[in-house]
């Protein structure tokens, strides 16, 4: 009887919380992806930052003439 109780307690107190922690981690990652997909300006902002780097100041940035820094 005590052995069965020990197994049940082990499952409830150790294995079940470990499984729920893994699910929460996956949900956090999905939420982060949703935030990135919902923000179309993030990609545009990255392109603008690349256009204003030192390569642009040297004259060989490879971006469009509309860059402003070229």
Curated annotation (Swiss-Prot):
One of its GO terms (molecular function) is ion channel inhibitor activity. One of its GO terms (cellular component) is extracellular region. It is found in: Secreted. Its main location: secreted. Disulfide bonds join 51-63, 56-67, 61-70. Expressed by the venom duct. Residues 1-20 form the signal peptide. It holds the Pfam family Conotoxin. Keywords: Disulfide bond, Neurotoxin, Secreted, Signal, Toxin. The keyword Ribonucleoprotein does not apply. InterPro entries: Conotoxin (IPR004214). Transmembrane segments: none annotated. Residues 21-50 form a propeptide. The cysteine framework is IX (C-C-C-C-C-C). Belongs to the conotoxin M superfamily. This is Conotoxin Cl9.1. It comes from Californiconus californicus.
